[in-house]
Amino acid sequence: MAAARCWRPLLRGPRLSLHTAANAAATATETTCQDVAATPVARYPPIVASMTADSKAARLRRIERWQATVHAAESVDEKLRILTKMQFMKYMVYPQTFALNADRWYQYFTKTVFLSGLPPPPAEPEPEPEPEPEPALDLAALRAVACDCLLQEHFYLRRRRRVHRYEESEVISLPFLDQLVSTLVGLLSPHNPALAAAALDYRCPVHFYWVRGEEIIPRGHRRGRIDDLRYQIDDKPNNQIRISKQLAEFVPLDYSVPIEIPTIKCKPDKLPLFKRQYENHIFVGSKTADPCCYGHTQFHLLPDKLRRERLLRQNCADQIEVVFRANAIASLFAWTGAQAMYQGFWSEADVTRPFVSQAVITDGKYFSFFCYQLNTLALTTQADQNNPRKNICWGTQSKPLYETIEDNDVKGFNDDVLLQIVHFLLNRPKEEKSQLLEN
């Protein structure tokens, strides 16, 4: 027999009408809004990425904090210390290298465009009447001085033993270049007041450290991460002239060059370049307190392993001019870049005025002339995204200073090469109009 079901009546209270319920809801809303308005709004710090997290946002925040530290540096020495403090593996860029087509690689590393020929001379203001005109150049005297310097090392100086071919650069060409530069600077000082107060260095080191491009770390505990490509140039010109005022620019700072920079898609290891880890250096040839902190002209002497005769024996005639161009691009970029950083500029605070320097590359007989204008230091991947500026290098083909030396006679002396050296040394800083009137 089925159990009997018991139904109990459900007692319900009195319900509210729709009008009453709507009024109650409106009153509750007004009360809530008044409470929220009366409560002070909490001000929380902005949500930023962690400084120690392994993410892109955290990496960008660490970079921004480091850049803010550099911007806040009170002096140039402090800024250089922060920029060169962290030591990582970096590529060693050698200005004088036997690598094939090194000039194209160096153009990419330094964001430099190479233009054949020398730049046009800057437009000079109308000269004011001077009470005492400058003395005219005596080409015959300059030619005699250059010939005496050649004969001093090739004929007059009696050595105890015969100089081998692989020793000519160090034993003969190096003292000849020293004597030629010092003599010409002394003779041309009356024509160029900047030379009289300039500093002439012999075998003074020049260093520059910079970042260009990125790579994915292939191995190690940081495998797969994105890292910067770092470069270091340790140069040692034979002679260099430093002045207290900056040379005049050849072209405007934002001059648009129609030539594209060679793009290298391979890693620098293929050049080949090798990585080392040691202290990062940025050095122009003197300390930051030296008043002669601007470059005028460098003189570089090629080693015997890069001499023209040796390259011809190796069937590398097409690499003769490449050696000159690569040396000029790397050396002048390092020198002008160090000058710019001595003035407080760096990759995140790009230059506001161009920096200009000149170079003479020689093997003792053949001379090549180059002019360099640094227009940008923003070479990192982040800084170079919207940067149309390019560094510019002008250069000439190498020409012989003389044909041969027989006994006590220099045959086939080339006056054009000597005049070009003189023209480089006579280049002076651009003076303001007020200074011209005072003089």
UniProtKB/Swiss-Prot annotation:
Instruction: Name the tissues where it is expressed.
Output: Heart, skeletal muscle, kidney and liver. Lower expression in placenta and peripheral blood leukocytes.
Statement: the UniProt record of this protein carries the keyword Transcription regulation: no
Pfam families recorded: PDCD9
Kindly list the places in or outside the cell where this protein is found, as annotated in its UniProt entry.
Mitochondrion
Q: Which GO terms describe its cellular component?
A: mitochondrial inner membrane; mitochondrial large ribosomal subunit; mitochondrion
Q: Name one GO biological process term.
A: apoptotic process
What the entry lists under InterPro entries is as follows: Ribosomal_mL37/mL65, Ribosomal_mL65
**In Gene Ontology terms, what is one molecular function of this protein?**
structural constituent of ribosome
Provide the assembly information: Component of the mitochondrial large ribosomal subunit (mt-LSU). Mature mammalian 55S mitochondrial ribosomes consist of a small (28S) and a large (39S) subunit. The 28S small subunit contains a 12S ribosomal RNA (12S mt-rRNA) and 30 different proteins. The 39S large subunit contains a 16S rRNA (16S mt-rRNA), a copy of mitochondrial valine transfer RNA (mt-tRNA(Val)), which plays an integral structural role, and 52 different proteins. mL65 forms a heterodimer with mL37.
Name recorded for this polypeptide: Large ribosomal subunit protein mL65
| Source organism of this protein record | Homo sapiens
Gene name on record? MRPS30
